[in-house]
């Protein structure tokens, strides 16, 4: 053999080896995708393997009585609060942990340090809560309590333990704080043409949750959201006599604070499917200054984890009846300044609230409270039981999307009481998911499909937008503590990815009939309770009838990518009449059920469904196709329902 021939052979071998080395190996590993899944929280007698509260499930309770006053000159809220805490746990409790969320506004707060001023504007710094007195009731008498404040938390040492299994203690707190003037901690006040609007939330010291998984859950308030106990509230707000107060729950003294005309119009609204004006723009302009006179507005709310309210002399007010299942009703209301009036603006707010509450109640779980109130004010885009805060300049679809989303939070987390601080997707993602269908349904799709900052903000199909997120190596998984998710990923991951995952689960994995039954059962089982992610996963598997370990692992616990390809189409014996074999490959770790579309040269089409079991043993599948006309092309996921990262290999054209 000549040296020249040897050189040629060696060069050919080198080229072949290089080509082999450059061919990317398929990263798909079915043993990894379909491995047994250990969920974050184990099944116990308290939380069952079926995703329901178990026979031993317990939950503590906090009932509140609060008398508050607002000094509108100094912008200070002062209050006297009594908390009755019931310990249903199996543990005697020697101390209580209280949440002091107003301390977020202190310049030395952990939340301000973490946000670097991004969330909390330095101009809104305050002293936080000023605690004038903290006492514990013992033998019917108040006893000064020893307490320690740490950032947004306070530990109160008790003179005697609260006994397990139903023991009670009463805590009295007298306090005041300066109301922050800029949004950042999810509340604010601001001046407008007809008077200041105060959106008051996190306005009273609140019990932390003591649960079966962590005992006291004492994550500090870093400007994300909340985890709260359920109970009943009686609260009163004293304000200048020219102000209107709208709050969570039922107004118990309308005869003391409303005019006869306002009471009559409210009665009319309770019987009307059309919006009724309770206070007109002209009446706002004609309201005289109150002088030194004040009014006290009293509210009551049951089965709630929180209350919030708004107050202003400049509110236009309207309302309409909400028709609930079983012949029940509630009242949709909106309060907004005259500058927000308009048929393309806040004059339609009550219609949006009414429609959303009616549809969510019919589809998922009946709305439980007497009122659903939308507020135009400075604390834009925030939700509380029975009341939500939105932007005074919102209009048209922007106002619709934000109104439907915020009132949708009545179900998640106000009814289904998840831990927003640890598992934000369980309220934001699930709520965004139910918003998708409200956007499709309202006024025959007037504003649908849902496309906003929370869900599919770009021009591409939602699946194609999600595919880009899955390729981002820095994107966190959905199951991340809320405080660790950077702002860049908050909406894309916590809202959009979680919601889109649930649409996949409903429309492509379980189907609407199985999904809806399982989802309704989850809501009913966990209403006014505290589910964790594992409870949701188990509930959907048990009632939905599928082992979804592969889906939870790939979509929620990881940020796995998805890539299907049509690699080859070959006729049997070269004859279309004898059939064809289509080779499909799964080229990445995330598996999803898919549709394979056969397009014939006659113009006919045929769809073949590939379940996830297709990929249980291998990343390559040869799909047999019955004999028929000549095939023009074969496409996997032709309708862009799946987040396929590379669509260039989704279609195979048959020459």
Model-derived segments and spans:
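Early extracytoplasmic/domain-onset interaction patches
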Residues: 23-99
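Glycine/proline-rich low-complexity spacer/linker segments in large multi-domain proteins
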Residues: 108-123, 176-229, 233, 254, ...
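Hydrophobic helix-coil surface modules that form long, contiguous segments used
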Residues: 205-215, 222-404, 433, 445
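Solvent-exposed beta-hairpin/edge-strand motifs
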Residues: 93-140, 242-243, 599, 604-609
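A surface-exposed beta-strand-loop module
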Residues: 23-28, 76, 86, 92, ...
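Short, hydrophobic/aromatic-enriched beta-strand segments in well-ordered soluble domains
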Residues: 81-83, 87, 98-102, 167-181, ...
């Amino acid at each position: 053999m000549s040296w020249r021939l040897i050189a040629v052979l060696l060069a050919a071998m080198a080229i072949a080896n290089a080509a082999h080395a450059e061919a990317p190996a398929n990263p798909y590993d079915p043993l990894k995708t379909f491995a047994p899944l250990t969920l974050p929280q184990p099944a116990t007698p308290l939380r069952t393997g079926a995703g329901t509260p178990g026979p031993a499930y317990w939950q503590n309770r906090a009932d509140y009585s609060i008398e508050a006053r607002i000094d509108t000159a100094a912008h200070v809220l002062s209050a006297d609060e009594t908390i009755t805490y019931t310990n249903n746990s199996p543990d005697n409790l020697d101390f209580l942990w209280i949440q002091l969320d107003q301390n977020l506004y202190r310049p030395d707060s952990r939340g301000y340090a973490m946000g670097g001023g991004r969330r909390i504007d330095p101009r809104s710094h305050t002293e936080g809560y000023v605690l004038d007195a903290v006492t514990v009731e013992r033998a019917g008498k108040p006893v000064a309590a020893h307490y320690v404040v740490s950032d947004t938390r306070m530990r109160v040492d008790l003179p005697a333990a609260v006994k397990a299994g139903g023991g009670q203690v009463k805590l009295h707190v007298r306090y005041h704080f300066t109301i922050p003037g800029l949004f950042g901690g999810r509340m604010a006040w601001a001046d407008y043409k007809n008077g200041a609007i105060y959106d008051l939330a996190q306005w009273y010291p609140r019990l932390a949750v003591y649960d079966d998984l962590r005992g006291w859950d004492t994550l500090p308030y870093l400007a994300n959201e909340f985890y709260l106990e359920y109970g009943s509230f009686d609260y009163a707000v004293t304000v200048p006599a020219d102000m209107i107060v709208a709050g969570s729950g039922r107004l118990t003294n309308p005869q003391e604070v409303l005019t006869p005309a306002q009471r009559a119009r409210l009665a009319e609204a309770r019987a009307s499917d059309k919006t009724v004006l309770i206070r007109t723009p002209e009446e706002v302009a004609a309201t005289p200054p109150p002088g030194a006179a004040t009014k006290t507005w009293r509210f009551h709310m049951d089965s709630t984890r929180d209350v919030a309210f708004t107050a202003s002399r400049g509110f236009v007010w309207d309302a309409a009846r909400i028709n609930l299942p079983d012949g029940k009703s509630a009242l949709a209301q909106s309060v907004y300044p005259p500058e927000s009036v308009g048929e393309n603006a806040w004059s339609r707010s009550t219609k949006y609230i009414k429609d959303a509450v009616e549809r969510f109640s019919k589809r998922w779980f009946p709305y439980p409270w007497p009122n659903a109130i939308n507020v135009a004010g400075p604390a834009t885009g925030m939700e509380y039981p029975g009341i939500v805060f939105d932007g005074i300049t919102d209009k048209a679809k922007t106002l619709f999307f934000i109104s439907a989303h915020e009132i949708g939070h009545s179900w998640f987390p106000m009814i289904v009481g998840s831990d927003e601080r640890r598992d934000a997707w369980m309220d934001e993602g699930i709520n965004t998911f139910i918003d998708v269908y409200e956007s499709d349904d309202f006024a025959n799709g007037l504003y649908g499909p849902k496309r906003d900052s929370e869900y599919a903000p770009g021009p591409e199909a939602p699946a194609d937008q999600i595919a880009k997120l899955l390729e981002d190596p820095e994107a966190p998984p959905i199951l991340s503590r809320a405080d660790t998710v950077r702002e860049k990923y908050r909406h894309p991951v916590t809202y959009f990815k979680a919601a889109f995952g649930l649409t996949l689960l409903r429309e492509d994995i379980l189907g609407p009939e199985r999904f809806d039954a399982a989802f309704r059962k989850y809501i009913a089982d966990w209403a006014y309770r505290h589910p964790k992610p594992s409870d949701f996963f188990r509930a959907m598997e048990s009632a939905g009838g599928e082992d979804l370990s592969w889906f939870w692992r790939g979509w929620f616990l990881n940020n796995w990518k998805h890539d299907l390809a049509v690699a080859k189409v070959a006729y049997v014996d070269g004859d279309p009449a004898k059939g064809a074999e289509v080779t499909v490959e799964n080229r990445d770790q995330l598996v999803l059920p898919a549709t394979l579309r056969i397009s014939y040269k006659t113009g006919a089409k045929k769809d073949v469904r590939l379940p996830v079991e297709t990929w249980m043993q291998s990343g390559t599948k040869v799909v047999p196709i019955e004999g028929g006309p000549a095939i023009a092309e074969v496409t996997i996921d032709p309708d862009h329902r799946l987040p396929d990262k590379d669509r260039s290999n989704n279609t195979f054209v048959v020459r």
